Amino acid sequence: MVVWEERLRHRSAGHATIEAVRPVLLDWIKRRHGTLTFRLTQVLSGHGCFGRYLCRLGREPTSGCHHCDTGDEDTALHTLQECSAWTEQRRDLVAVTGFDLSLPAVVRTMVGSSTGWDAVSSFCERVMLAKEEAERERERTSLLRSRQRRTRRRRRADFDLRPP
């Protein structure tokens, strides 16, 4: 435990996650409920189907949110706290957690009870699944457009090579 606390003091990445977990680290370790899932980890770490992260990796041209009209940067916190596309899912979450959806408050809720953990996990699963499906659809559409452009160029090139 002391080694973990020391490593967290000298962090190199994941600042927001560390700051959220550090105050409840002992409770996090001792809890008997909840398991981390892929999608829950995406929201806690900010590494997932978020415009900022995908843009940084070169998989999106901008970091803007594709799901709302605000033009805000798409981050885990934007998804958790603000994005209008997830209002219904957020309503279910707030009913259990209260209105403070800051990362430290969400982590405290998760550690505090299995009901809290399940509410946060359910939000993450539902929202991230929808975001992943939307990202795959954007990739398919982009790939289809790219193939159509290549095919048209090839046809023109083939036509130019035909004898008169």
Tell me the role of every PLM-derived stretch:
Residues 28-164:
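Family-specific functional microsites
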